[in-house]
């Protein structure tokens, strides 16, 4: 049933792009906000972020956990749909691709957990002072992305409905 597999794959791509677009935009906006004060994008510059920017730490944790595919965040739905679409193909190459994806997911999750550990457990780097503030536009972007990341994980039907190809084709007519 190749048509079902093709539709499943296309739907998972749309879901993945929407969710990961929000999640990555939010994460990079946090990196920009932190780098404005620390003058660095290095992981170490996030040290002790919880002590001087708890809100930013929580938001970045949401984005990183979503990127790692931790439920109930949007990244979990995106990864689940992607793996399901690949496995629906039922071929040996699909299983190999899923195994490679699983290994990549585990490696990426370890990286994201490392960043979270630095933010929550490490001390603030020596000589780093200043409060992290964001312009309203960046703050709004981070907030919208965080809300979208959480809501699409809890209510995945919102993005799944958007990814319904029959509806998308109907809109294009």
Predicted segment positions?
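Alpha-helical transmembrane segments of multi-pass membrane proteins predominantly involved
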Residues: 1-173
